[in-house]
Design a protein with these regions (language model features):
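Alpha-helical transmembrane segments of multi-pass membrane transport and lipid-handling proteins
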Residues: 2-6, 101-131, 182, 189, ...
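Interhelical loop/hinge segments that connect adjacent transmembrane helices in multipass membrane
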Residues: 2-21, 200, 211-255
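Membrane-water interface segments that mark the loop-to-transmembrane alpha-helix transition
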Residues: 19-35, 61, 73-123
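Alpha-helical transmembrane segments of multi-pass membrane transporters/permeases
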Residues: 22-34, 140-146, 159-185, 197
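Alpha-helical transmembrane segments of polytopic membrane transporters and translocases
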Residues: 44, 56-73, 102-106, 205, ...
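Helix-loop junctions and terminal segments of transmembrane helices
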Residues: 74-90, 162, 220, 277, ...
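Alpha-helical transmembrane segments of multi-pass membrane proteins
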Residues: 116, 120, 131-156, 170-171, ...
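Hydrophobic alpha-helical transmembrane segments
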Residues: 137-141, 170-219, 240, 278
């Protein structure tokens, strides 16, 4: 009798888990459809207002940002979701707050690492991406706020997913998709090529703010950057995340190498054309897998 009850409990948990996954996939499938439409409109306006040169610059800045982010995120967004889910189901509110403090503290240190890496790599990236010139270091360094915003958003999103706030995450994705369109196009229109970095900083900053707005209401924001206990508690997640960091860095390095190769024998217009074709053939189709990954 006891064995039958245990089997029924296991089956019930599996059924609930499958239902949760299906609900997650369905909701995010709808969100990805919205993001697809908004992305098409945004890319069309960007190509019209900035031309192929501006679109190429967008590709270069995005690849640099992605590379630095993957180098420094320590795999935290991937590894912390499961632990947050376990604490949400079986732990106490204080344990959840303590874990969120650990995640956010490590995110702060990854942001510091990203700032240092951006400064160190800025001369090299300027040389390879801007016709062997060294005077674009400041532009690369100015991408640092984007990286920090990405790291913050990823950390908060991992907590929300762990707490199974499916609708909150879907709402965030929808808001970010629309606000990205509304916040970038004015910069492109009024400032042209000079407004690209400002537009990217504004859009990623809004994304980080929206993620924080939803997550802080559930778990108050608290960090302890100099607490050895907090750092030790987060270290296992960093250690497990090392393979993800290596694979993500390798993939983003390959993505960054393509514009470098194009620029070695072409110009920024060619990079823009490549990026547009890549978005049509790969980027939009990949949104389906993003919905499944969620």
């Amino acid at each position: 009798m006891q064995k039958d009850l245990e089997q029924n409990n296991v089956k019930g948990k599996k059924t609930a888990s499958y239902s949760h996954v299906l609900m997650f996939t369905g909701i995010f499938g709808g969100v990805q459809s919205l993001k697809l439409v908004v992305s098409v409109v945004r890319n069309k306006l960007a190509s019209y207002l900035l031309g192929t040169t501006g679109y190429g610059l967008l590709a270069v800045y995005s690849s640099i940002t992605e590379f630095v982010t993957n180098c420094c995120n320590c795999g935290i967004p991937i590894n912390t979701t499961q632990k947050a889910s376990e604490l949400y189901e079986d732990g106490t509110a204080e344990q959840m707050k303590d874990f969120a403090c650990t995640v956010r503290t490590w995110v702060v240190w990854t942001a510091v690492a990203a700032m240092l890496l951006s400064v160190v790599l800025s001369p090299v990236l300027s040389y390879f991406f801007f016709e062997h010139q060294w005077d674009h270091c400041l532009e690369v360094i100015l991408l640092t706020p984007m990286v920090i915003a990405f790291l913050v958003a990823e950390g908060e999103c991992s907590l929300l997913k762990g707490m199974r706030k499916v609708r909150s995450v879907a709402t965030i994705e929808s808001i970010v998709a629309v606000t990205t369109l509304l916040s970038t196009v004015p910069f492109y229109y009024w400032l042209g090529l000079r407004g690209i970095i400002l537009a990217l900083i504004a859009s990623t900053g809004i994304s980080a703010f929206v993620h924080l707005w939803f997550s802080v209401r559930l778990v108050p924001y608290r960090i302890r950057p100099f607490s050895m206990r907090i750092l030790r508690e987060g270290w296992p997640f960093v250690r497990r995340g090392l393979p993800y960091v290596i694979s993500g860095t390798a993939a983003s390095a390959a993505g960054m190498a393509v514009p470098m190769v194009i620029l070695s024998s072409g110009n920024m217009d060619d990079v823009g054309l490549y990026r547009a074709a890549f978005a049509l053939m790969v980027g939009y189709a990949g949104m389906v897998f993003v919905a499944l990954e969620a």
